[in-house]
Amino acid sequence: MVGSRFEVDCGQVGHGGFVVARTDEGRVLFVRHALPGERVIAEITEGTTGDSFWRADAVQILSASPHRVTPPCPYAGPGGCGGCDFQHARSDYQRELKAAVISEQLRRLAKRDLTVEVEPVGESSLGWRTTMTYVPASGGGHGLRRHRSHEVQEIDQCLIATADAQPGCPPLTRAVVGERTFDVPDGGFWQSHRDAPQTLVDAVLAAARLRLGDRVLDLYAGVGLFAAFAAGAVGESGQVIAVEGDPSAAASAKLNLSDLPQARVIAADVAAWLDSSASPQGADVVVLDPPRAGAKRRVVEGVCQREPRAIVHVACDPAALARDVALYAEQGYDLRSLRAFDLFPMTHHVECVALLT
């Protein structure tokens, strides 16, 4: 089956960087490197007769979308690097596709109809990524994985990476946001877009509307980015507790927040900590930035049990966010606003900041 080719009409965008199409026999295809409305030759890359859908690449464009452009990267396209999904689409149209995915996931998983706009961030869709993980290539150089594969595409440069994140460059270990400097452990998590930290801090603070004296929980706190600015907003009469499960990130957070007496760092699993008697039973505001899989029921229930007046939920996966929004609704917290940011241009990924009250 792999390698077979079909002429298909491409439908709506799907969650994961593909568009949905059907063969004449009704077989569902998830087609990469295509755009809605195009007619393409799709070559099957994964699938057997018993599968509910097959994965495919658009290897020939028979009728092109007006939103199609020539990919700037020579490694983008079928069989190349798997990092970027939408280099063949105009930047504004990429954001439209991502907005459609967010709306569809909220409608399908949270039963919420919401018009979403994905906001552009930065001046360019290239040269934005400050952290990269390259793998050794057989030729002795560096490369990136192909899509859904362990095979390596050797590259000489990555066009979405900054000059300091090209192959052979040392990893990011320190970052400046506003007037604060953050220690970042080697290999630890840090927002990859160079403008993401300030963008998200501004969005979180705008949603949280913190007051002097507030008690704030910052869950999945990483190296303390949100906690640092929340501490400034609540003042020394307030309190910020930052909870992070990764020991190296928690150690960096303690260093980064050491000048803020109202901030405290707890190195612990978030769900277990919320269940423990050591955690406070109340909070005015909860900020959480869970991993891609989402917060899930145990954490959502633990957060809501604190009865905060506001929950600010940062999410990098629309489906996980929608599932969590549905869980919040079960606990009486409704989605009041949602902002989406194009922090991952050229890819299908998108960042959301949701306010629930």
Residue spans of the language-model regions?
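Hydrophobic beta-strand signal
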Residues: 41-43, 133, 217
